[in-house]
A protein has these predicted regions:
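Short amphipathic alpha-helix used as the core "switch/output" element in two-component signaling
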Residues: 61-72
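Acidic, metal-coordinating helix/loop segments flanking the phosphotransfer/catalytic sites
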Residues: 30-48
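The feature encodes the CheY-like receiver
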Residues: 56, 84, 102
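Active-site residues of response regulator receiver
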Residues: 52, 80
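Short, Lys/Arg-enriched segments at the junction into DNA-binding effector domains
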Residues: 3, 115-133
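Two-component/phosphorelay signaling modules centered on CheY-like receiver
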Residues: 10-29
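Acidic catalytic/metal-coordinating carboxylates
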Residues: 33, 59-62
Length: 133
């Protein structure tokens, strides 16, 4: 079962994301702070992370860099109100696999989440195949 970790401090949006992205083959884990996300990551690695930038206990961009150092294979999508070109470029250059600005379309979000999950699965399959050759 694929797990998606959502790190979003807006409780209503966090709950809405969980509802919108849940399927029979997905488990959604929601956190509202970086600390809660770190604690959750001790329990296991998700298949994908949705990460807000403006969090109450720190910068999502700083956490993004930490995550990419520790868990480079996990796709991370930034989901944020920071919508200038400079913000988007900075997020992508720091390692985000995608960048979605608020407000957003649920259908676009679902498509981007599905794309990142497919890419990660394909990469994992290629890596496994390479190891066993």
């Amino acid at each position: 079962m694929k797990q998606i970790l959502i790190i979003e401090d807006d409780t209503a949006l966090n709950q809405g994301l969980c509802k919108a992205l849940k399927t029979d083959s997905r488990k959604l884990i929601s956190c509202e702070t970086i600390k809660a996300a770190r604690d959750q990551l001790l329990c296991g690695c998700p298949s994908l992370i949705l990460l807000d930038i403006n969090l109450p206990d720190g910068s999502g961009l700083d956490f993004l860099q930490e995550l990419k150092r520790e868990l480079p294979a996990i796709p991370i999508i930034l989901l944020t109100a920071n919508d200038t070109d400079l913000d988007i470029v900075r997020g992508l250059e720091l390692g985000a696999d995608d960048y979605i600005t608020k407000p957003f379309s649920l259908s676009v979000l679902r498509a981007r989440v599905n794309t990142q999950l497919r890419k990660a699965e394909s990469l994992q399959a290629q890596t496994t195949e390479h190891v066993y050759r």
